[in-house]
């Protein structure tokens, strides 16, 4: 069910020593009623045409949208997904770079990590024009993220804006903003599982969650030391020599 939702503001964190996230420029925000679509024309078999509006500044090249079971790059060869909504080895994985050029790989292995996190291995590295997303560097307390804005994606290749409601040791949950000023929000439903959510840090998308539950959305929190430890071990099991990239919030 669609509903107008507009976020209070986007936030950028300035360093790991900052006590509070700082407000980002309004240039980071979509216009009221602006289309949430990432693609103007999407193609599984060929190149795509990207939207020319605000969503063009959000680098979604590291997200594979060719199936509802979305995959998100965390190394040049590893992708994460919802464990309860996995793709299978042998499946084709299609990305589109920021110019809309199609890039294909094959999924050759998938293993569960912890909770609702699974990691997959591609048959070869992706090129540097695809985005590999950083995860939040662990910190003692993430509670200051509560009330800030996250970019939340869905199965129909769109970007929405929800507030962070809570951050636990291994999970994070979102809510719809009470005050609507920018962009759209949506109630997440069946089929949205595994789609990623991001926090904006110094103009970069940092992966914080993949959907497990609907409504405002909730799922595993990728700033969790436990999840990062288990994920790193699984990455090494599938193909050694790759490391997660972490970014301080």
Residue ranges and their predicted role:
Residues 94-98, 153, 198-200:
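A generic structural motif
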Residues 44, 53, 62, 66, ...:
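A structural motif
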Residues 4-12:
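Sec-dependent N-terminal signal peptides
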Residues 22, 117-192, 200, 211-233:
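Chymotrypsin/trypsin-fold serine protease catalytic domain
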Residues 75-76, 80-115, 125-127:
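Catalytic-histidine neighborhood of serine endopeptidases
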Residues 20, 25-51, 71-86, 171, ...:
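C-terminal subregion of chymotrypsin/trypsin-like serine protease catalytic domains
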């Amino acid at each position: 069910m669609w509903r107008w939702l507009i976020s209070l503001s986007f936030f950028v964190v300035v360093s790991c020593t900052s006590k509070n996230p700082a407000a980002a420029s309004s240039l980071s925000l979509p216009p009221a009623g602006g289309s949430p679509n990432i693609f103007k024309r999407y193609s599984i078999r060929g190149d795509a045409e990207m939207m020319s509006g605000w969503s063009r500044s959000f680098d979604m090249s590291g997200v594979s949208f060719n199936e509802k079971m979305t995959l998100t790059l965390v190394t040049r060869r590893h992708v994460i997904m919802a464990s309860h909504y996995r793709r299978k080895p042998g499946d084709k994985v299609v990305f589109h770079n920021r110019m809309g050029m199609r890039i294909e790989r094959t999924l050759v292995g998938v293993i569960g990590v912890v909770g609702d996190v699974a990691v997959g291995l591609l048959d070869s590295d992706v090129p540097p024009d695809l985005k590999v997303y950083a995860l939040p560097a662990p910190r003692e307390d993430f509670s200051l993220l509560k009330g800030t804005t996250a970019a939340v994606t869905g199965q129909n290749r769109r970007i929405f804006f929800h507030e962070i409601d809570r951050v636990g040791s291994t999970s994070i949950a979102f809510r719809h903003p009470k005050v609507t000023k920018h962009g759209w929000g949506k109630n997440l439903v069946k089929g949205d599982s595994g789609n990623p959510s991001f926090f904006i840090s110094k103009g970069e998308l940092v992966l914080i969650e993949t959907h497990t539950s609907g409504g405002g959305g909730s799922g595993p929190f990728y700033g969790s030391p436990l999840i990062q430890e288990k994920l790193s071990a699984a990455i090494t099991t599938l193909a050694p020599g790759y490391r997660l990239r972490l970014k301080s919030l």
